């Protein structure tokens, strides 16, 4: 069986799969985008804005993170996602305030730290301001990639900032008066952003109080975006609209963002909360199923003799071993477990690790 944990940061929710100690199946580590879309579907799957894999490190980090958007595409980084992963690590490993992790991501090494109040302070690294690093075709003007973008029905003055992933920030007078979804969808795929982009509409309430609405690349409207809040502050500072520290309000709640001295790393502080643990049903397992995830043999004895055989490699179009199918055997094992286990027992099994983590956290808070 494949267990998962669901966490959310300001309503931006993720399914986390633990693979630091026990190897995840190959079909999970390199997931089919269709499987990710199925998991994230809020009607026919579990529901989420993305899937996070916690994996062994490849370099000098404590672990490695891969994150996939709800549309199945892989993202370089996600601020809310990395806070959720850090909260998961703290809950799973019994860590206390002051614990700091070095997490490898495609955007570089990111370092979240657990605070005394349970929030996560994340060193997000320095912003990317050169157009080629974002990437964008917008010109660099006074240290910021910016210009006018033409849409079908309007022209918008925009600024682009990279936080390991691309962002475009559009200052507006009133967030409630813009055609958010139409402009957001158009800007995400605009030719000025060759890798597509996350889109943030910004209303400035005060130099230390900003408000944004988020159109996330690969996910659409979302309640929050941590890297987007960081990119927004950087753009607002360079446009002369904000100080180097501000509260950034999102539909899901506020984040505290700082860019000390307008140079070096951007710092993000915000919450992350456990929602529930679960076990994927056979219908939600990736297909073709990697037999190693169920400790089935990697090779099967066939009528022709000893032939190495792998479902994931050889059964792409149809089962090649109908009389001795590893996938069927694995599904039968799962089905036998489901048939022989009461609903209460399954619920207890699915919630046990979350209960243990929650109890440990409460014990630490009391101490």
Give the location of each predicted region.
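Active-site-proximal beta-strand elements of phosphoester/diester hydrolases
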Residues: 123, 157-162, 268-269
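A glycine-rich beta-to-alpha transition motif near the start of alpha/beta enzyme domains, typified by
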Residues: 1-117, 168-292
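Flexible, glycine/proline-enriched loop segments at strand-loop-helix junctions
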Residues: 75, 125, 132-136, 171
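Cysteine-centered metal-binding/redox modules
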Residues: 292-367
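Active-site glycine-rich loop that binds ribose-phosphate moieties when present
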Residues: 128-156
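Internal active-site segments that recognize and position negatively charged phosphoryl groups
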Residues: 145-177
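Transmembrane helix-loop-helix hairpins in multi-pass inner-membrane proteins
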Residues: 117-122, 127
């Amino acid at each position: 069986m494949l267990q998962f944990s669901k966490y959310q940061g300001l309503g931006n929710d993720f399914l986390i799969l633990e693979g630091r100690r026990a190897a995840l199946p190959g079909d999970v580590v390199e997931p089919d985008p269709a499987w990710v879309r199925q998991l994230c579907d809020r009607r026919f799957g579990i529901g989420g804005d993305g899937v996070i894999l916690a994996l062994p490190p490849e370099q000098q980090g404590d672990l490695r993170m891969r994150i996939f958007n709800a549309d199945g595409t892989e993202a370089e980084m996600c601020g809310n996602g990395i806070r959720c992963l850090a909260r998961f690590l703290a809950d799973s490993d019994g860590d206390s305030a002051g614990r700091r992790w070095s997490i490898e991501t495609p955007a570089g090494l990111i370092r979240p730290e657990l605070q005394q109040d349970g929030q996560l302070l994340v060193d997000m690294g320095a912003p990317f301001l050169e157009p080629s690093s974002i990437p964008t075709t917008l010109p660099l003007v006074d240290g910021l990639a910016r210009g006018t973008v033409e849409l079908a029905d309007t022209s918008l003055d925009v600024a682009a900032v990279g936080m390991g992933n691309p962002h475009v920030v559009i200052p507006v007078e009133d967030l409630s008066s813009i055609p958010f979804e139409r402009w957001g969808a158009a800007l995400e795929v605009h030719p000025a952003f060759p890798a597509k982009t996350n889109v943030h509409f910004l209303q400035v309430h005060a130099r230390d109080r900003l408000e944004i609405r988020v159109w996330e690349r690969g996910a659409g409207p979302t309640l929050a975006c941590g890297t987007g809040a960081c990119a927004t502050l950087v753009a607002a500072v360079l446009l002369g609209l904000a100080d180097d520290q501000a509260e950034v309000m999102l539909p899901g709640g506020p984040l505290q963002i700082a860019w000390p001295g307008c140079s070096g790393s951007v710092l993000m502080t915000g919450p992350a909360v456990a929602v529930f643990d679960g076990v994927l049903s056979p219908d939600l397992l990736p297909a073709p199923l990697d037999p190693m995830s169920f400790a089935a043999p990697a090779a099967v004895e066939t009528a022709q003799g000893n032939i190495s055989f792998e479902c994931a490699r050889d059964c792409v179009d149809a089962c090649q071993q109908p009389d001795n199918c590893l996938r069927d055997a694995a599904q039968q094992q799962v089905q036998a477990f489901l048939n022989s286990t009461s609903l209460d027992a399954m619920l207890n099994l699915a919630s046990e690790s979350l209960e243990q983590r929650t109890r440990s956290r409460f014990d630490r808070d009391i101490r």
